[in-house]
Amino acid sequence: MNIISKFICVLFIYIFAVAVYSQDESRASRTWSVQKYDITASLPQSENDRYLNVRAILSLKNVGSGAASRLTLRISPNAEVSAVKINDAAAEFTKGEEKIGTATLQRVILRTPSVQSNGNLLISVDYKLKVDENSGLSAISPVGVQFLPLSFWYPTPNSWYFARGADFAPLRLQVNAPNGQTVVSSGALTANAFDQKLNVQPFFITGNWDTITTSNVSMLIPKGMSDDAQKRANELAVLANEAKTFTAGLLGAAADIPLRIIAVRRGAGFSGGGTIFVDDNVFRRQKIDSQTVMTIAESIAKMWLGNIATVGGDGFGVIREGLSRYIATQFIESKYGKEIADIERLRQRTAYAAIVKRDSPLTIVSPLDDYYFPAVTNKGAMIWRILEKKIGREEFYNALRSSMKDGDLQLSELRSAFSAQKPFLDYAFEQVTDMNLLVGLPQPVGGETKVALRNVGSIEAQVNVTATTAIGENLSAQTTIPAKGFGEAVFRTNNKIVRTEVDKDKLYPQTEYSDDTAPRQFDESDAILVIKRAFDKQDYATAEKNARTVLQTSPRLDDARIFLARALSAQGKTAEAEKEFQSVLNENLPTARSIAWANVGLGEINLKNGQLANALKYFDQAVKADAEYGATLASRQGRNKASNLATIEEGIKNFFAQFDKAAVSNRKTEVQSLLLSGEVAKFAAGLSGQTEQWQTKVLQVDKFDDNNILVETNLNVKLLNREPESGTAIFRLTKIGNNYKLSGVEMFEVR
């Protein structure tokens, strides 16, 4: 071997060793575990103060195998740490930076007295945290403050991005808030502090709500909402209790955990320790939507899977997210029926199919990966479904309850409990999905019909194969297709088979689902995308045809039915379209998007027929739904055609007269004086120094609650070095005392 060859060989070995070391470091075992958070936060006393002042006390335990004398805490880079104490003694610290994908965390690095394995440490951190612009993760304003875990507002050793799971621990949280604001977190409220015995990540929100307590669930809805909002609140409270009872039947009785459901403008879908955030628009809609039901059911399941029992280790997301979704879907099936649950499974399967070809094994996928949630949640739910089917419901949940008894639940522990299924679980968790099931065209042979099957995956598939005859007869056959092999299903019938499908129940994660049927319906797994593509091209006949094809096998899929109705309406098939729109509204659990478009469609039909009062009713419902940008825009345009301009309150007129004047003054301070603190900063920055003309005409006003309104306007504007522009803009105004402040730009169709 010559010198160059030796050098290349050594270099290769070195690079390989560094890569292995780096990979090992990225998946390092945790050294410190939080045993309890004790946090006191003080909110700003003035509108212009953008700082949250905090003292966080962390009780830590060395869970490593040896002594530890170094501690690194992670916190937001916007935190200004002023003091740290170790066991009540002042300590020196250094700061560092930690790159997390495209984001950055701040490191607070401490040298500590040597702490032996299983030893404890008490850390106190004083700091203030600045919020420049409000978001769903962190917000400070006179009407409400919100801090969620992913804003990294509190120090902790293991952040959300830690490969083996973030820190969850019992919490005591006290928030010193100005008078008039209600503080909400999780746990029991005692002596002005929240005491949470379960394992949670710290969070809180403040605001001004009406509280309705139903079935031991506290519903916090915006003040002054309608009677319909109270009906939705009661329905959600009953739903949460039913989900809790259902989950307790599977995973064991829960402690007496206070349940709270909070209407929020931002951050809907978050939950922790029995407190659940839902979109405040839910309470304005005419019925509950499917996503809200899934959010509540999953949040209830996570009380067991993460709060009662901590969930960590490699593949923790498969339990916390995937098993929670599986149980939530089972609850939906118990309440709404199998057809509705199958629609939810179809949506989950479609979401997973979108990322399957860049997937990672579930034991190593990280929250840093942009496909993390579609993978661990949806593929995870499918795996638990297969496992329960293989071993039986009773054995499955007995093993889960047994594994949770010690208050800790890890995927490795569950895999040991289900050791008889090791080949399947090794494939499911440690390999990327490589299965694709294919079905051939039916081949009549004598008095029977044979169907060829293929499995390109690494494990066998036990599947149900179905066939439909020319006279509408449905047949089924059970068979096992070997790994990387072929199989066959035989149907004993003299009738002609016109359609076959493999894995009718869609148990298995696959790289492609469109070839599960013969003849093939579409060339891709997302059937809704196929329909939408034709609709967006204004090929309404093809969109109608594709929608009808999908509805033959999934008649309760409101996503497809709403496209069918819209395609029919676009072709002038008004009677058929009206029937389909109404069918969507009659569904038990449609999406919010479908609710909105069904109302838009019925409003447009009534408008064409001269039924202005009915048209207004439907357009108003679509505006209230506020579920999709296009539906909201269409409903507002339709409403303006069906009605005269509304009577506008003088205070609103005066506000926009002031805003028009401030905009053309090109003085930043004048514009900012009309904005709610922390809101619409980028919009305001776009006006400063560039506005030559700004004229606002108020068209409609929609009262959201006692303190918030949506104002529909027509704008005529001219910015520096640009042509004059005009169009519709929807502004959100919030009342502070007797004055309005601009708190949001919900729509800006100014061209």
Question: Can you describe what each PLM-predicted range is?
Answer:
Residues 82-85, 421-425, 437-504:
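Beta-strand-rich binding/interaction modules
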Residues 56, 173, 210-317, 323, ...:
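Juxtacatalytic substrate-recognition/specificity segment
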Residues 470, 482, 611-612, 688, ...:
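Exposed beta-sheet edge and beta->alpha loop/turn motif
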Residues 365-366, 373-445:
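Amphipathic alpha-helical substructures
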Residues 315-382, 386, 390, 404:
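Acidic/His/Gly-enriched intrinsically disordered linker/tail segments
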Residues 57, 108, 113-116, 120-209:
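Extended, low-hydrophobicity, Ser/Thr/Pro/Gly-biased non-transmembrane segments
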Residues 78-143, 485-496:
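A surface-exposed beta-strand-loop module
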Residues 20-53, 422-423, 561, 599-602:
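N-terminal, polar/Ser/Thr-rich
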